[in-house]
């Protein structure tokens, strides 16, 4: 009844009001970065339409199926309604809104251009999350191929090869070397399959813990990834795009270049670029031009350096950096699509070699027996 009364005050006469149920499937859903990007885009849209801030929270919150996201929006609304600024309200949720995000919102509130800043932040979040998704896709695809190949091979070795093995024992002859190797591998997996699974799990767990706890391990991994064929190029272009996109967004918001570089450092997602940005910050703080400093790092591509130089000379640095980001985002997109196209026949080839090799190994003794009988 309170909801009906509230709506009537706004000139809306509802015929029926019912409580929206919570899906059991969505009850435990986490708040994802794309949820935050959507929230930001909707906030920018609402403010552009002249909807009051507190009312915007109500409308946006109801639009999310994820109950945890609705709860987050409601908590932000409560903070703002109690007198806190939007930026300070967001700072109380650091697990969802990083320092860069909050600083940009703060700049928008201070300058009276919150709508424009939210629009820029929304674009930034959408672009960066899209880029991350493409990188995950590029990395996941070959891993999926390897896993499928291993599972198929394991099933054949554990379930199919033993059927042939009983036949081979009746031959009373020495098996071909290739067949004997496959039989030995089959016997090993039949006896030790559980230990193999535990071992693989232990390796995965150790890798995860090292990545979480050891900075040296993470640094080494980041440097190694950049040197990988195909994947290294995708990660490199992604880091350049994230660098340019972050710096363009912060600089356009009126953040001083040296301060903007603080935000850029962690946004690239790779230690090689993080170290390069730290050096650039030191150089720029002493008066060196951004493009000169980028060149001295030997990390950034010439195109990005030249576009930065043009931006500095013409006074349109944010615009030029945005063009650099868009170019490398498209490059990543094309590279991932090409990789996917390349991997499809590779999957068939790998599976064909594995399955075909096992079949040949099983039939070699039969062919030899046929030759002897002939």
UniProtKB/Swiss-Prot annotation:
Cellular component aspect of the GO annotation: plasma membrane
Mutant lacking the gene: phenotype: Deletion mutants lack surface pili showing the essential role of PilC for type IV pilus (T4P) biogenesis. In addition, PilC mutants show a diffuse cytoplasmic localization of PilB.
Consequence when changing residue 215 to Q: In strain: PAK
Amino-acid biosynthesis found in the keyword field: no
GO BP terms, alphabetized: protein secretion by the type II secretion system
Matches recorded under Gene3D superfamilies: Type II secretion system (T2SS), domain F
Main location: membrane
Record field: transmembrane: 138-158, 187-207, 347-367
Complex formation: Homotetramer. Interacts with PilB.
Protein name (Swiss-Prot/TrEMBL): Type IV pilus assembly protein PilC
